[in-house]
């Protein structure tokens, strides 16, 4: 946030048009829940804060780019949620780039795998969350990003007395066939449910 505000202040006094625009370009990498949320918040800022607090920017505009390597946003959610998020962000003026990957960020330029470059001084990386690796939990117990496969009770696949919650786990359900999004609210809900289940397990032992 501080970096973004500093860049906006720089843009108001910058006399080089190319540098001025680079200061106003924001690139968000990762079209998951966090990337969509951040892009939405930035678009609100673009619409309601900039005209009021930074009138000196004149004809220059903040450009928000959301880059996702797969074919859709919110890959862990339903097709309807993905489509709605894309339409909402596009209506808010976000430039969505799908099926492209960032291969480098050098000298203030973002380089994509198709050769496209985007000059920016603000790069927000919210892609590629990888779970912490645990010894002896390997192979068929893991899925993409080394997330641990669990059932609806957060039990690790095939292990009745080991549980996993939050970013580290992968639980497939009809509404989330690719696992739940790796956000705080999911971890909180799983933690509360697991606490209740562990209490029930202990009660049954007595």
Where are these regions (language model features)?
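Glycine-rich dinucleotide-binding loop and its adjacent helix/turn
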Residues: 1-34, 41-48
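Short helix-terminating capping/connector loops at secondary-structure junctions
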Residues: 16-22, 53-61, 206
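Internal hydrophobic alpha-helix adjacent to the cofactor/substrate pocket in enzyme cavities
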Residues: 44-47, 185-206
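Active-site flanking residues adjacent to catalytic metal/cofactor-binding acidic residues
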Residues: 36, 67, 165-166
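FAD-site-proximal beta/loop scaffold in flavoenzymes
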Residues: 1-17, 109, 117-196
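Cofactor-binding loop segments of dinucleotide-utilizing enzymes, especially the Rossmann-like FAD-
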Residues: 31, 69, 167
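A Rossmann-like FAD-binding core segment of flavoenzymes
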Residues: 43-152, 156-158
């Amino acid at each position: 946030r501080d970096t973004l505000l500093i860049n906006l202040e720089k843009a108001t006094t910058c006399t080089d048009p190319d540098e001025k625009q680079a200061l106003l370009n924001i690139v968000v990498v990762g079209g998951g829940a966090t990337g969509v949320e951040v892009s939405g918040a930035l678009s609100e800022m673009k619409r309601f804060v900039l005209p009021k607090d930074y009138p000196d920017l004149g004809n220059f505009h903040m450009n928000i780019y959301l880059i996702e390597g797969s074919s859709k946003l919110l890959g862990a959610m339903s097709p309807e949620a993905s489509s709605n998020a894309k339409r909402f962000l596009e209506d808010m003026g976000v430039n969505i780039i799908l099926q492209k990957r960032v291969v480098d960020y050098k000298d203030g330029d973002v380089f994509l795998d198709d050769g496209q470059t985007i000059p920016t001084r603000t790069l927000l990386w919210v892609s590629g969350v990888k779970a912490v690796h645990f010894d002896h939990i390997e192979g068929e117990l893991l899925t993409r990003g080394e997330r641990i496969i669990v059932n609806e009770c957060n039990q690790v696949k095939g292990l009745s007395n080991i549980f996993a919650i939050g970013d580290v786990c992968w639980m497939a359900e009809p509404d989330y066939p690719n696992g739940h999004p790796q956000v705080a609210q999911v971890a909180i809900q799983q933690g509360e449910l697991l606490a209740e289940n562990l209490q029930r397990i202990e009660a049954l032992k007595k």
